[in-house]
Amino acid sequence: MSMTTLVILRFAGIFAAYTGLTVLLPAIMFRRILVGRGLSEQFLMCYTFGNFYIINIVFAVQLLHISGLWALVLFTAVPGILIWSRVNRVSLRELCIKTGIICKKILQGSMGMRGALYRVCNRIKAVLKRSVRLFYYKVICNTLQWILVGAVIIALFWIYGRNLLLTYGYCASDIPVHLNWINEMVRGNLFSDGVYPFGFHCMIYYLHTVFRVDTYAILCVFYLVQVFFIHMVLLAVMKLLCRSLYLPYAGVLVYILGNLWAKQTYSRFGASLP
C-alpha cells in the first residue's frame, strides 16, 4: 500500500469516527427535539453538544482515574441511551420486555428465525423509506444549494487537503508538545505539567483510546478534519444570520480562496493544533 493511499484511508477513518461522535450520536439522542428545525440549526446543535459530551466524558474518567477503553465506552453509551430514551419518550423497561419476549419465542420455537428476520427487515425498510424521503426533501429539493456546498468542500480540500498528501508530518513545531500531553493522559496523568488539556487533547485521546489509532498518526491528519468542521460551522452560522440563500456560500468561498489576511491567520489551518 502506498503512503498516499494509507494517509487517505487513515483520514477517512478518523473523519468518520469524529463525525459519528460529534454529529450522528447527538442526532440520534435528540431526534425528537431536532425534528422540524432547519438543517443548519440541527448541525450546530448536534456538533456543539457532541464535542462537549465527549470532552467532559474524558475529563470525568480521567479525574476518577478509571480512564480506559471500556470506561470511555460505558460512559458514552449509558448516558447516551438514558438521554435518548428520555428525550424521545421511549420506555427502556417496555423495550427490554418486548425484546425479551421475542427472544423467548425464538428460543421456545414459537417464532422461527424467518419471522424474526421478517420483523427486522420491515424495520430496516421503514428506516430506509424515511431516509429516502428525508434525502429527497433536504437534498433533491435544494439541489443548487448542495452544489454550492460541494463547491465549498472542493475549495476547502484544494487549498488545505493537498498538504495532507504532500507533507507527511506534523507541519508545526509545537505539535510534539501536544503529543506529550496526550501521551501523559494515556498514562493517567491529566495535568502532568499544569492545567492545560483542553478539548483538543481530550478528543484526540478519546479517538486514540476507543478506535485504537496511534496518537501521532491522528495528529498528522486531524487538522483537515478540524478545518472542514470550522468552515462548516461558519457556513451554518452565516446561513442562519443571512436572509440571502446564496450570500453565505459566497462569503465562505471568499474566506477560503481569498488571501486577504496575514499569513498567521491561515497557518494554524495547516496543522493539528488546539
Question: PLM features: what roles do these ranges have?
Answer:
Residues 148, 152-273:
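Active-site lumenal/periplasmic loops and adjacent helix-entry segments of GT-C-fold
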Residues 51, 56, 88, 122, ...:
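Detector for Asparagine
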Residues 1-136:
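Membrane-embedded, hydrophobic transmembrane alpha-helices
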